[in-house]
């Protein structure tokens, strides 16, 4: 994986976390334990600190960056969907930012909230806890139901299990030239582990 030091600052990646080999971490990046960073994600701690706390996931093609001396933080069990952009913002514990959403400088997403796909959260916006946040510009439109909170928790758990799966079985290979006879499909047990 491309990990770069800049101005004497080296990214911190605990052994218990997984960073895909195509993700890029630069400078003042601090990952917690059990963090998943997906393919082609870019975490640039070359102006401000990037913090991803325990159990959070940063999915494929996400960008985390900020202005000089400005932290960008994802709280514990945070869930950042594919191609989201976080710039100098704070995502509180157990919040989800949907695919292609943008959260701008100084914005705060309250804990347990869900930012909908393609939402645009303006700079300095403060969004409440336990709310659905959608639109461009984004607005907190209603409280989340227990079912929605459970759905979010389950999705994040799937990525926490994926950390272990990747560390144990992900490796680069040459492709097959044709489908092998009896090709298996991924089928999961109640703990989200593939059945053998």
Curated annotation (Swiss-Prot):
CDD domains: LbH_paaY_like
Keyword rRNA-binding: no
Alphabetized Pfam families for the sequence: Hexapep
InterPro entries: Hexapep (IPR001451), PaaY (IPR011974), Transf_Hexapept/Carb_Anhydrase (IPR050484), Trimer_LpxA-like_sf (IPR011004)
Alphabetically ordered keywords of this record: Repeat, Transferase
Keyword Repeat: yes
S-S pairs: none
GO molecular function: acyl-CoA hydrolase activity; transferase activity
Family per similarity comment: Belongs to the transferase hexapeptide repeat family.
Protein name: Phenylacetic acid degradation protein PaaY
Organism from which the protein derives: Escherichia coli (strain K12)
Source lineage: Bacteria, Pseudomonadati, Pseudomonadota, Gammaproteobacteria, Enterobacterales
């Amino acid at each position: 994986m491309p990990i770069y030091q800049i101005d004497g600052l080296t990214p911190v990646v605990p052994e218990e976390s997984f960073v895909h080999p195509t993700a890029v971490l630069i400078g003042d990046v601090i990952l917690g334990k059990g963090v998943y960073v997906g393919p082609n994600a870019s975490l640039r701690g070359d102006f401000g600190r990037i913090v991803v706390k325990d159990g959070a996931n940063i999915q494929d093609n996400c960008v985390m960056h900020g202005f000089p001396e400005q932290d960008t933080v994802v709280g514990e069990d945070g869930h950042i969907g594919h191609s989201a952009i976080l710039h100098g913002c704070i995502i509180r514990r157990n919040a989800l930012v949907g695919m292609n959403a943008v959260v701008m400088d100084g914005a705060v997403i309250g804990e347990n909230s869900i930012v909908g796909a393609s939402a645009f959260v303006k700079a300095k916006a403060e969004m409440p806890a336990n709310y659905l946040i959608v639109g461009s510009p984004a607005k907190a439109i209603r409280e989340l139901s227990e079912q929605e909170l459970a759905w979010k928790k389950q999705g994040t758990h799937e990525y926490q299990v994926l950390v272990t799966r990747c560390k144990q079985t992900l490796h680069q290979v040459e492709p097959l030239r044709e489908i092998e006879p009896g090709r298996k499909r991924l089928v999961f047990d109640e703990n989200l582990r593939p059945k053998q």
